[in-house]
């Protein structure tokens, strides 16, 4: 009998230990990881102003440069955003400006002003994955894609460059220029560290890398990034030389009026 009581007591202790042991948090879903990454990468702060240098490098190592100012504002909790980009140089693109009205769940509205023609051109939704001013980034890369346009699955967890990362596979729901994308997303800062794009034959197409990440105030920011076309060997490097958050931008800056006449206070 004493032995029986002892066995019962040990069983109760074991049961209590199991119940009281801290539960290990489940990993977030692939969709939740990508959602948080889009928020960290494209929505940090209420607004931003950034001085940006872009280098377009061909396979022979020849370089073309672009200098621009980027403005962005978030419009409340709806997820709507406005982007404005003004090109300071070189001469062939000086005065060109680019405007995006972004809406979660549907196609963004995009316009570009070409000063040589004094023309504001609307960019068709089908062109959102075409090259942004001759670079290896697309218009969609600049302002972000819709979460619902792809399915997302967590593949594994691993370190990349000393940072803990989730590896997520995303597949477009419709036929587009790539068949799938692998993303390495920092599991603490939620910024994308690397992305690999594959074409319809599952051959490597483009690779994005976050080359320099810094903390600006409260925000972690990818200050240098690059995109390489693996099939043409052309690559684009982008460096944010200055990044300011929460400077008090007004929504009326992001209109056609300022495509033609840049808001000097903000793009000087």
Which stretches of residues belong to each language-model region?
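Short, ordered beta-strand-loop transition motifs
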Residues: 74-81, 156-164, 215-217
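Residue-level signal for alpha-helical transmembrane segments in multi-pass membrane proteins
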Residues: 13-16, 20
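Short, low-complexity, Pro/Ser/Thr/Gly-rich segments in the mature regions of secreted, periplasmic
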Residues: 257-267
């Amino acid at each position: 009998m004493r032995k029986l009581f002892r066995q019962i007591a040990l069983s109760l202790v074991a049961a209590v230990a199991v119940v009281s042991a801290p539960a290990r948090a489940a990993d977030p879903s692939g969709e939740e990881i990508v959602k948080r990454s889009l928020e960290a990468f494209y929505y940090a702060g209420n607004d931003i102003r950034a001085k940006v240098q872009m280098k377009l490098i061909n396979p022979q190592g020849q370089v073309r440069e672009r200098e621009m100012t980027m403005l962005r504002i978030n419009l409340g909790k709806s997820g709507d955003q406005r982007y404005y980009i003004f090109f300071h140089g070189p001469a062939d693109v000086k005065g060109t400006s680019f405007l995006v009205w972004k809406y979660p769940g549907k196609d963004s509205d995009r316009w570009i002003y070409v000063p040589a023609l004094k023309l504001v051109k609307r960019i068709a939704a089908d062109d959102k994955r075409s090259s942004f001013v001759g670079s290896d980034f697309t218009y969609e890369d600049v302002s972000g894609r819709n979460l619902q346009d792809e399915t997302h699955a967590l593949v594994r967890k691993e370190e990349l460059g000393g940072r803990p990362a989730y590896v997520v596979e995303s597949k477009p729901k419709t036929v587009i220029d790539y068949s799938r994308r692998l993303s390495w997303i920092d599991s603490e800062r939620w910024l994308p560290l690397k992305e690999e794009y594959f074409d319809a034959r599952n051959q490597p197409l483009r690779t994005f890398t976050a080359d320099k990440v810094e903390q600006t105030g409260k925000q972690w920011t990818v200050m240098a990034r690059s995109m390489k076309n693996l099939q043409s060997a052309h690559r684009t490097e982008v460096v944010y030389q200055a990044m300011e958050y929460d400077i008090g931008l007004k929504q009326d800056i992001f209109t056609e009026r300022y495509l033609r006449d840049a808001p000097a206070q903000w793009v000087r």
